[in-house]
Amino acid sequence: MITSDAIIWNAPNEPHPARAASQRSYSAVAKGDLEEWLTVYAEDAVIEDPVGPSMFDEEGKGHRGRDGISAFWKLAIEPIDTFEFTINDSFANPDGNTCANIGQIKTSFADGSHTTTDLIMVYVVNDDGRVASMKAYWEPARTMASFTQAPVA
């Protein structure tokens, strides 16, 4: 089990390029480090988070390339004060380029409100070990149902 202040890894952790890339991605997000996060992704990477049309991607086509991925960060990640990733299982394919992580992300905002998202994240890496595709399967309505308003002072 890997544990940091923001990442709890309860899943198998055999060496695997896609699994390692996913862990680097979680770490950069937890630190709020956009530049580090961008180094995890290939220049032409696509992020679909969540898969399909959503408040982050009305057409459901994903965020493509550096500009698209940076825009996704500003829209979906930057407003969050803290992240806690808990990965409960991870399935990796034998050829080493894909893994699917099953877990939960708890997010907190500066005002004290928070959400919990149960999800499956699928990472595909290129020959350089950088993420070429990341698809996160989760339901925005379920996340919003978990929203807890900050206490009123």
Range-by-range predicted roles:
Residues 2, 118-146:
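Short beta-strand edge/turn micro-motifs at domain boundaries
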Residues 1-39, 43, 151-153:
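Short, low-complexity N-terminal intrinsically disordered segments enriched in polar/charged residues
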Residues 84-86, 102, 115-121:
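Short, surface-exposed coil-to-beta transition loops
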Residues 94-105:
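A short hydrophobic beta-strand element
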Residues 42, 109, 125-126:
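Short, acidic, Ser/Thr-enriched surface-loop or helix-capping motifs
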Residues 25, 37, 45, 65, ...:
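Hydrophobic pocket/interface hotspot
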